[in-house]
Amino acid sequence: MTRILLLLLGFYQYFISPLLGNNCRFHPTCSEYAKEAISMHGSIKGLWFTFKRIIKCQPFCNGGYDTVPISIKNSKPLNKKI
């Protein structure tokens, strides 16, 4: 499922997005955010993060720099005990 979603996003970015122009209020763009979220968290959780991001991408939001939340279980510890 993850691979299919990433292929669909790639299709959108290559063929559809150039026709629509740059309308995203955020960096990275919503489609790039979706690719990162799905790659990092899998299809279900990645789609949930993408849905929340697209809801925020509207005229009443200032936009800006917004990254995909990092999963605590996937992150590496900052320091090691010796």
From Swiss-Prot:
Belongs to the UPF0161 family. Could be involved in insertion of integral membrane proteins into the membrane. It is found in: Cell inner membrane. Signal peptide: none annotated. It comes from the Bacteria. The keyword Calcium does not apply. It is a peripheral membrane protein. This is Putative membrane protein insertion efficiency factor. Pfam families: YidD (PF01809). The lineage of its organism: Bacteria, Pseudomonadati, Pseudomonadota, Alphaproteobacteria, Rickettsiales. The keyword Membrane applies. NCBIfam families: membrane protein insertion efficiency factor YidD. It comes from Rickettsia africae (strain ESF-5). Its main location: membrane. HAMAP family: UPF0161_YidD. InterPro entries: Membr_insert_effic_factor_YidD (IPR002696). Keywords: Cell inner membrane, Cell membrane, Membrane. One of its GO terms (cellular component) is plasma membrane.
